[in-house]
Amino acid sequence: MAGRRATPGLMAVRAAMVATLAGPLLAIVAVLLVGADAVSLETGLDLLTLKVALALSVLAVVVALVAMVIAFRTSLRLGVMALATLVVAVGISGAFLWRAQVMAIAGPLDVTTDLADPPAIANAAGPSVACPGVSAPMTQSAQGTAGWAMQQAGFRITGASLFQIRGERTGAVFGLTHEAVIRIRPGQTDVRVVARYDRADGGETCRLATKLVDALQAGR
């Protein structure tokens, strides 16, 4: 015997759920494609995630809103399901919009606590600039403290000597890479962080420099 035909309300709820999942699923696919070097960062992040997935998430809100109206006309249970889907769709859309706005902020990509004599980082384009409110710890940090600070800020230590610690950090999502160096001198410890990309990053480079300085001060 043939199964019962789906009601308009049920079909609307299903459509809303599919639409709500489309944006996040595309973003996940974009991350995987960038990680596999199948597409460029510009294609995966700027196009697929911050434009197409964002547009899909906004469209999902519209679909979920229409679905809620149809579902409530069918039954209370389907209406509640559609309402829950709408709430999720609004949350996802808001998250995409927030991320797009943050990533559009053009923060500095080469920052240091010593503008007169920044710690050296190979192939850094420069010039280094200061981050607002971030200043060098006016003390000579121990090598162990500097290494701990690197790890606390999410950097993998790539080189260490008596007066210098180097590290590299690769973002977990789209692989945005930063290099950092902590230079130890009598009476002062300086930090430099350089982004290995040329794009707006919402101030991520300054945030990492702040994390390093805060960790150095906490480890004194």
Feature roles, as predicted:
Residues 3, 28-53, 57-60, 64-80, ...:
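Ser/Thr-rich, low-complexity intrinsically disordered terminal regions
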Residues 11-18, 75-90:
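Interfacial segments of alpha-helical transmembrane regions
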Residues 1-38:
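Membrane-anchoring/interfacial helices and their immediately flanking loops
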